[in-house]
Amino acid sequence: MSKKYIVTLFIISCYCFNVLAQGPIQLHQYPQRFFRYPLDLPPSTAGSFGELRGAHFHSGLDFKTNQTTGYPVHAAYDGYISRLRVQFSGFGHAIYITHPNGYTTVYGHVKTFTPAMEKLIRDEQYKQQSFEVDFKLDPLQMLVCQGDVIAMSGNEGASAGPHLHFEIRDTQTEETINPQLFGLTIPDKVPPTITSIGIYHLDGNPFSEKTPRQFLAVAGSNGSYRLAKPQILNLTGQIGFGLSTTDMTSVSPNHNGIYSCELKVDGKTMYTFAVERFAFDQTHAINAYIDYPELMKTRRWVQKCFILPGSKISLYPQSINRGIIDFNDGEVHDVDYVIKDVAGNTSTLTLKVKSGRAEANAPVLKPAGNLFHYDKVNEFNSDKVKLQIKPGNLYDDLNFTYAVLPRRPGAFSATYAIHNRFTPVHDNYDLWIKPVSSIGKFADKAVIVSTDGALAVGSWDNGYIKAQPHTFGDFFIKIDTVPPTIVPVNIKDGANLAAAKGVYFRMGDNLSGIKTYTGKIDGKWVLMEWDFKTKVLRYSFNADIAPGKHIFELTV
């Protein structure tokens, strides 16, 4: 195996940059003759690269596995197993292979690993005394060749159904790259679908839920779209556009994401978006790309065709004035949307816009509260509440608002409206709330919760409970005095388990969640596996446990 690996290295050094990808809008070129599909199934996807997810851009391709598990997963190319990961949610079970051509492939949600990998993982779990492990391997520790079976497909972790999540990453930068740009194409002759457009009246004001907006239905099919109600749009001032769009392939009915969107005015490109590659620290900035307030209010996904000043994503190859159009010359203009999937199938929509004449000094809304700047440290202080937001954690300037609401039953503080849920933040921020004096001995059990049920576990900090929420909203202090629950499934005191494969429990918590759990047999730590979806904790008997009477102890 190692001999073949060395020969392959030589071939790559000769050819990997001579055969380059030719495709849609992209800033880089990628080798085309190296990677194979990771499954021996006709390629069909349930999720596309870069498609819109709840709080991130999808980072790979989700290959379908006929709604079942157990298909062999193959190494996409020669390389070495560089990382193994087991986690409750996320990918569940994941394998990382580093290749000599500068890329790393990732295989997520697999059911089982090879026996050699299983042993390494088990040894690491016992070493760390943890079910969740994430560790790296030496380059010569576990070599693989293209096509080697490395796992069986599964449904582990935060997976909505059996499939294989597959990624190609830049080994050096760790950016994830669209796998279809490497020639791993999916049969696709279907152009994207456009269902509506959005029009935003910006006029120099920060983007928010108060930004005037309107949505217009779209009619058409097979790549040609128009407004459902034909009209010339009368627009004046600084305007941003958006649209609702999805894409399908020829082999799957799933509604996935598009690859690129280009906005032109009178033939001139003003804005371009393309899901070629991105860094993982940018993925939460999906909330700067979409109309986040509209999603929170109506669950409608609208992709904005203009860029917020604090946006962190590198998916905009080209833009003029951040895609914001000034309509103030009194002329009629053609506005064209050009939407493509990664296969190059194209859909277009053309609008006629009659421009008005904007006032020399368009009115700018006065802040309703404290003006926070997206590129500066922002702080707010009152006698009961403090907060601090680091630079870059907002996507635009913010007219921050704050209010004190009545104390809720069982709460140990008033409820504080920390702005509102319609404005996203990129990362956690610091929030301090002062509890009522009666909290006393319960201070170490205090947590900060929001009225929508989200939890920000707190800690005592100089008279305040400090937490780090990742959203704005209405927050208050509660105390968590109820211990987690443990419900035995197939075990009881004195039970005879000679014929059983293991012991099973259900565990849960009513507020702050499960932090740790520890299982012991006769005082020795044993590996307990937590199933994220079924909420079942299990210990599987193995040769380490001799027949006879044993004492099992579980601490949660």
Where in this protein do the model-derived segments appear?
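Short, solvent-exposed loop/linker segments at the N-terminal edge
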Residues: 225, 231-236, 423-425, 493-499
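Surface-exposed, glycine-biased beta-strand/turn segments
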Residues: 21-104, 111-116, 131-133, 137-140, ...
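Proteolytic processing hotspots in large secreted/extracellular or virion-associated proteins
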Residues: 360-363, 368-374, 400-447, 491
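Proline-enriched interdomain boundary motifs that mark the N-terminal boundary
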Residues: 191-196, 483-490
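Long, low-complexity serine/threonine/glycine- and acidic-rich segments characteristic of extracellular
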Residues: 115, 145, 187, 202-208, ...
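Short edge beta-strand/loop segments characteristic of extracellular beta-sandwich folds
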Residues: 242-246, 432-436, 502-510
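Proteolytic-maturation and junctional protease-sensitive modules
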Residues: 419-475, 516-518, 525-526
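Bacterial Sec-dependent N-terminal signal peptides
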Residues: 1-31
